[in-house]
Amino acid sequence: MVCNSKKSETESPRGRPALRTGFSSGTAAAAAAVAALRYLISGTSARAIAVKLPSGLYLGVPVETCSLRDCVASAFVIKDGGDDPDVTNGAQIIAKVALLRNDPEKMCGKNPQPPQIILCAGKGIGTVTKPGLPALPGEPAINPTPRQMISENISLELLRLATFELEGLQDKACDVSDTSLCAEKAALRLPLNANAKAKTVLGPAGTFSLLIEIEAPRGEELAKRTLNPRLGITGGLSILGTTGIVRPFSHEAYEQTIHAAFSVASSTCAKTVVLSTGGKSEKLARQRFPELGPEAFVQIADFFSFAVREAVMLGFSRIIHSVFFGKAVKMALGYPYTHAHAAPMDLQFLAATARSLGHKEQLCQRLSLANTARHGLDIIAEDGSFDIVEKIARTAVEQSVRVADEASRAAVASQSAPIRIRLLLFDYDGNLLAEAGKEA
């Protein structure tokens, strides 16, 4: 079955305009690689490529241009993330493909070199420098699923090409010294999972292999707006994707990002992670904990419970939350996910907290009628009743401890000592209002 990438939309609740899905950078890279191979071998310039996804479905991906220079064919695809607000949306993903003559000595020796795919990162594609990520240090930042997609779709294209009468392959091939592809960065060697008929395109007895370089012309610039610098990915973007499809505002994608950040922190032997909801709360926490490495600071957005569970499962012994008042209230309410669409602010809870501390009913009524959490905090500050803030902080920590305990019980190997959890609660000007939990 072939899906049209231009018409794939998510269902729209309550009559809101549907959000259009798109395709991942991994799908874009696979499409570009197939288009370049087709142009190199057959001279056909594809307008679109049907990319086989991990699910087994096919997705039609438009191809912008194909070209040939010397022995290297190029094709580029514009990454279309649909309505997902990703910085790579609209980025050019280019694949350059060359037919590489295999070393005759290896071919004729006891261990003949089989046809293979040599895949590397070109301009604007990052290189992994830290452990804890799906790709190993020194490898191109091309994740396992995109690697598999490139390998499988190239193999399928070779099978398609094998049905044609192809001539002059020797004239299309080059030696390593004839091309600058993969000259500066580490390369991956991927198996060519093609049947014998498909491999005949690469000549008798594995005469040729395929050299594929993936580029993103603006990748280094765009990567500065991603988590790559923090994750230790240098020089550009990552080629990502687990399904090949990008779903707008995907929870799964953000959870994978949090998990990756934790994995990097764990690989540095960090025992503490500082969970912030965004850049400002992270900056405030960094000022308080200059002794912690940059990997220890993880922005979790609204994924409160997920982040705590992941931290426990990965064996961290201390969690520090850095939050503003509104998020602290939602944490105290026990919301696992604190985004406004899923977790409406309950200011009656704020009023009930004030009552439990013996405050006058007039203050409690004002809090119950506040417009926002920020407004509620202004009322508290005006009254000088900061014990309410401290109570909210303590309750938020209790909820975090509850989530951590549940995760510990669910883990195969529970931690020998309870995880220590601490919370720093800031006002909207960056002043520390309250601390709660262990070490507070």
Q: Where on the chain are the PLM-derived regions?
A:
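A structural signal for small-residue-enriched, beta-sheet-centric alpha/beta enzyme cores
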Residues: V2, S12, R20, S24-G26, ...
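Generic domain-boundary/flexible-linker signal
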Residues: K106, K130, A223, L284, ...
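Phosphate/pyrophosphate-binding loops at sites that engage ATP/ADP/AMP, CoA/4′-phosphopantetheine
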Residues: L158-E165, A404-V412
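Short, conserved catalytic or adaptor-binding loops enriched in Gly and charged residues
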Residues: G203, A413-Q415
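Short, low-complexity, polybasic intrinsically disordered segments
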Residues: A223-T234, L433-A440
